Design a protein with these regions (language model features):
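Catalytic Walker B motif of ABC-type/P-loop ATPase nucleotide-binding domains
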Residues: 154-158
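Conserved ABC transporter NBD signature motif
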Residues: 56-63, 76, 108-111, 117
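A short, proline-enriched helix->beta-strand linker immediately N-terminal to the Walker B motif
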Residues: 148-152
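Helix-to-loop junction immediately C-terminal to a conserved catalytic motif
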Residues: 48
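ABC ATPase signature
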Residues: 91, 133, 146-147
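ABC-type ATPase nucleotide-binding domains, specifically the catalytic core motifs of the NBD
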Residues: 12, 52, 68, 93-110, ...
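The feature captures the beta-strand-to-loop junction immediately N-terminal to the Walker
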Residues: 33-35
Length: 183
């Protein structure tokens, strides 16, 4: 379980988050909703460790991770897909997926079949450059890359923004599948 308790986050003198609480249970989908500029992305950046908080606590599976760097949080099973997807445009789909190997033990360095079951288009495009994919295909690639790490918590920022409806349905089905399997 993820527990965010009374966190504050500042960018210089500007306060982005004030007293935020959030809990997310295993096997559940938790959504953070709000208009532009209210701190949704800042909250996600704090959860994954990209932005330090000035007050409060972030716990994952009963462990205080507030001061852990992002790579340690990733090792604990937290994966993040940012709003801009941040795929590598000059690398192939295969190479993009393999960038997730960096934090894995040698025996775990493979792309799980589940990635291609959820997003079959990726298998068909393994040799294509990431930058040649549509926005929706890039989002599928970003989610697939995160799934290579076999996360227990998947943090998605605006996962369907600017994507065609058919791919939104594919992403929704993938999220439902991951929820039902419990992580």
């Amino acid at each position: 379980m993820l527990a965010v308790q009374n966190i504050d986050l500042f960018y210089g003198a500007a306060q982005a988050l004030r007293g935020v609480d959030l809990s997310a249970d295993l096997g559940k989908v938790t959504c953070v909703l709000g208009r532009n500029g209210v701190g949704k992305t800042s909250l996600m950046e704090a959860i994954i460790g990209n932005e330090p908080i000035s007050q409060g606590e972030i716990r994952w599976e009963d462990k205080d991770i507030t001061r852990l760097p992002p790579y340690e949080r990733a090792r604990l099973g937290i994966a993040y897909i940012p709003q801009g997807r941040e795929i590598f445009p000059l690398l192939s789909v295969r190479e993009n997926l393999e960038t997730a190997f960096a934090g894995l033990r040698r025996r775990d360095r493979n792309v799980p079949d589940e990635v291609f079951e959820l997003f079959p288009v990726l298998q068909d495009m393994l040799g294509r450059r990431g930058g040649d994919l549509s926005g929706g295909q890039q989002q599928q690639l970003a989610i697939g890359r995160a799934l290579v790490t076999r996360p227990r918590l998947l943090v998605l920022d605006e996962p369907t923004e600017g994507i065609q409806p058919s791919i939104i349905k594919d992403i929704g089905r993938a999220i439902s599948y991951l929820r039902d399997k419990g992580g």
